[in-house]
Amino acid sequence: MGDIAAAGFSAVQTSPINECLEGEDGGMDLYGNGKWYYHYQPTDFKIGNYQLGTRDEFKAMCDEAHKYGVKVIVDVIANHTTPATDEVSEDLIEAGGGILNPLSQGGRTPLNDFGDRLACTTYEMGGLPDINTERPSFQKYFFNYINDCIACGADGFRYDTAKHIGLSDDPKR
């Protein structure tokens, strides 16, 4: 972190630190089964995954960054889960309304019209099951994750696929 601060940078952004799909062979091979985009396929909203480390390691990194005046921005995904739905935690499934329920009002319908706000916020994007972000139980579950990130030292967030996150005043079916 000292080198980052000395180079004039005031912030770093992490990849998503949530639990995510590992793939085969533990997912450690970035060019094989442990692809970078697995970080964007949450299996739960708890800190820690097989490539970026544990909650304690994240906290230690934040503490080190703050020693040098470097802020930590965390990339977060609130919109969807992994398509490997059998890997998604029961807690997340329950908070999101259930995969077979489905997770969102659009079900497993593929998104084809990116200009349609209802479709953008309720349909699957790229085969990734949409989460019903309008659901209060999911909001509470997700904010518990965000608050844990803050408790560990996160200073800010970048929301991936922000335009696909449904809001309470969005159109309904």
Model-derived regions: residue spans:
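Receiver (REC) domain switch/active-site residues of two-component response regulators
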Residues: D155
